[in-house]
């Protein structure tokens, strides 16, 4: 499973390339995720992403990441080109382009590089003689495609990833190709209050791969735009996995975020409802973002 997809709560572009430039803002984000904190050599993932609109109907996006899990590491990235078709003449956010109703398409080229850390051979010199470690790295390209539609408060997206069934030659053998996977999500933003400075956003996401392994996320977010200088949001999320081999079959994830000027700060905590609960302190994620223009609510 691509670890970065689990960070979509802070940036929907991570699961759907059509989100590149879909919102009236340019967004830069850096995040750090620590899984199963408290256990030795717990996994850790760092991510840097950017998305913006460069012309009236064209958006671009990119991210790079690094993941460490024990002696193995993975690095990679993605570059995206998206096209947005306005479907209304509203002027809610911009004097030039309408973002109220919009249909977007996006395609990405992505790549991953796998390698074994040298620390393995320091801790276990005999590993140098193991033929399984004759080839300790591998490069794997792939592609994604996505569609995104928004109509005022409603939004829905469909994306397909790992479109090319390529396998990396690593650990002395061919690895299985990354599974062809689809994401379907949808939600609605309800404006609340006389000034409509508060909002409630229910959202659901369904993920399924070619092996019929299914994840379903149910999310409920509440936000308050106190003024143009700052705001906050809180969210409760629940994930259920229809895959008996997934040790995170059920996951609870509360999270919160703040907007201070053009800066955005977010924190998420995940707790898997399984036997590992008593052996670790859950998964922690911190996000810092910056928007280059004012965007009502949180930039998807």
Regions found by a protein language model. Name each.
Residues 1-300:
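Subset of outer-membrane beta-barrel
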């Amino acid at each position: 499973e691509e670890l970065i997809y689990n960070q979509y709560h802070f940036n929907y572009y991570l699961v759907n390339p059509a989100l590149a430039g879909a919102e009236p803002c340019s967004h830069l984000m850096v995040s750090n995720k620590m899984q199963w904190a408290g256990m030795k050599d717990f996994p850790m993932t760092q991510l840097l992403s950017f998305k913006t609109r460069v012309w009236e109907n064209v958006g671009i996006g990119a991210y790079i990441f690094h993941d460490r899990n024990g002696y193995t590491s993975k690095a990679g990235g993605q570059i995206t080109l998206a096209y947005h078709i306005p479907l209304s003449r509203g002027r809610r956010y911009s004097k030039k382009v309408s973002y109220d109703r919009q249909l977007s398409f996006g395609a990405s080229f992505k790549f991953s590089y796998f390698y074994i850390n040298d620390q393995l051979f320091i801790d276990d010199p005999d590993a140098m003689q193991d033929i399984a470690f004759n080839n300790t790295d591998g490069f794997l390209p792939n592609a994604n495609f996505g569609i995104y539609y928004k109509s005022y408060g409603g939004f829905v997206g469909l994306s397909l990833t790992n479109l090319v069934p390529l396998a990396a030659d690593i650990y002395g053998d061919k690895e299985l190709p990354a599974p062809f996977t689809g994401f379907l999500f949808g939600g609605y933003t309800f404006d609340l209050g006389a000034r409509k400075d508060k909002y409630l956003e229910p959202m659901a996401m369904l993920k399924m791969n070619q092996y019929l392994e299914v994840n379903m996320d149910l999310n409920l977010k509440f936000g308050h735009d106190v003024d143009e200088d700052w705001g906050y949001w809180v969210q409760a999320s629940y994930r259920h996995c229809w895959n008996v081999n997934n040790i995170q079959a059920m996951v609870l994830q509360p999270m919160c975020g703040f907007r201070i000027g053009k800066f955005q700060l977010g924190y998420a905590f995940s707790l898997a409802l399984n036997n590992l609960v008593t052996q670790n302190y859950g998964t922690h994620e911190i996000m810092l973002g910056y928007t280059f223009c004012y965007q009502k609510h949180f930039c998807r």
